[in-house]
């Protein structure tokens, strides 16, 4: 089943795609520290995080002690508080509970970063990837909590090693005549979050599909549920969360995975 497919990335590898932390291109010190912490998180803790937010996980990783250079340690002393911009509607990676506390997979990783480095985080809420990137570019934040790399974003941002792996999927309405493959969407509307790494692929491989970009994945799912789009594309981990929610569970379904590229 789809619910078993959430898998934490091997933090020791520089994998090409996946949800990552992102920093300004001119902030390599912070990036190096984050990568060092991700690489040193023990297997047991990674396993715990994965199982907390999914039905299970298959993780084969090695434990390593955190080793920071003298320069990185000095940088931490000079920057004890970091402004972290988070998408407040990006469950199960980042969302806020009824008490206003940050929750999700990425929230757990931020807590491990805090415990291992002493970093303190000032949270900045956002509702879209574009806004989060803009806050980094304008130096109003230091770190994006969860973002997918793309060629456009990599012009101004540096990405940590990915911490979550997952495929892109096609969401459709629960209907007998719903499309089962993107090829069946020619001339129809496909909703996708603005800035998604899948946008260029879809335009290249399926030029007759009418892409409708939304500010976030929730917006894309809403367009689909309301009948204003015929499909929506997102990563599997987010699709799982959406279709298990009370809002969409009786309306939407995961139809198929899209190509071999990893979303997270």
Predicted regions and their residues:
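N-terminal hydrophobic or amphipathic helices and topogenic motifs
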Residues: 6-7, 11-17, 26-140, 149-158, ...
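Short beta-strand-to-loop elements that line the ligand-binding cleft
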Residues: 10, 120-128, 192, 209-220
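A ligand-binding cleft/hinge motif common to bilobed small-molecule-binding domains
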Residues: 1-15, 130-134, 146-156, 201-204, ...
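Flexible hinge/capping segments at coil-to-helix
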Residues: 161-163, 172-190
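A short beta-strand structural signal in non-transmembrane regions
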Residues: 18-24, 262-264
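Ligand-binding cleft/hinge of the Venus flytrap
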Residues: 1-4, 94-98, 107-120, 160, ...
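Short loop->beta-strand "edge-of-pocket" segments that line small-molecule binding or catalytic clefts
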Residues: 77-88, 103, 182-196, 210
């Amino acid at each position: 089943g789809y619910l078993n497919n959430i898998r934490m990335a091997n933090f020791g590898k520089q994998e090409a795609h996946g949800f990552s932390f992102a920093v300004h291109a001119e902030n390599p010190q912070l990036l190096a520290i984050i990568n060092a912490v991700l690489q040193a998180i023990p297997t047991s803790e990674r396993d715990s995080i994965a199982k907390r937010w999914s039905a299970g996980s298959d993780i084969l990783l090695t434990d390593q002690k955190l080793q920071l250079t003298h320069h990185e340690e000095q940088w931490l002393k000079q920057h004890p508080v970091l402004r972290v911009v988070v998408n407040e509607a990006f469950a199960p990676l980042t969302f806020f509970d009824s008490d206003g506390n940050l929750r999700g997979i990425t929230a757990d990783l931020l807590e491990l970063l805090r415990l291992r480095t002493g970093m303190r985080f000032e949270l900045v809420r956002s509702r879209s990837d574009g806004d989060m990137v803009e806050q980094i570019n304008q130096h109003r934040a230091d770190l994006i909590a969860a973002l997918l790399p793309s060629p456009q974003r990599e012009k101004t941002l540096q990405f940590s090693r990915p911490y979550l792996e997952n495929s892109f999927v096609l969401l459709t309405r629960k209907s007998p005549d719903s499309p089962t493959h993107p090829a069946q969407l020619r001339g129809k509307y496909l909703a996708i979050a603005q800035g998604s790494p899948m946008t260029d692929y879809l335009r290249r491989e399926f030029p007759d599909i009418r892409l409708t970009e939304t500010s976030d994945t929730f917006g894309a799912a809403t367009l689909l549920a309301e009948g204003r789009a015929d499909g929506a594309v997102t990563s599997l981990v987010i699709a799982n969360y959406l279709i298990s929610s009370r809002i969409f569970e009786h309306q939407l379904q995961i139809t198929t995975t899209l190509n071999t590229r990893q979303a997270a």
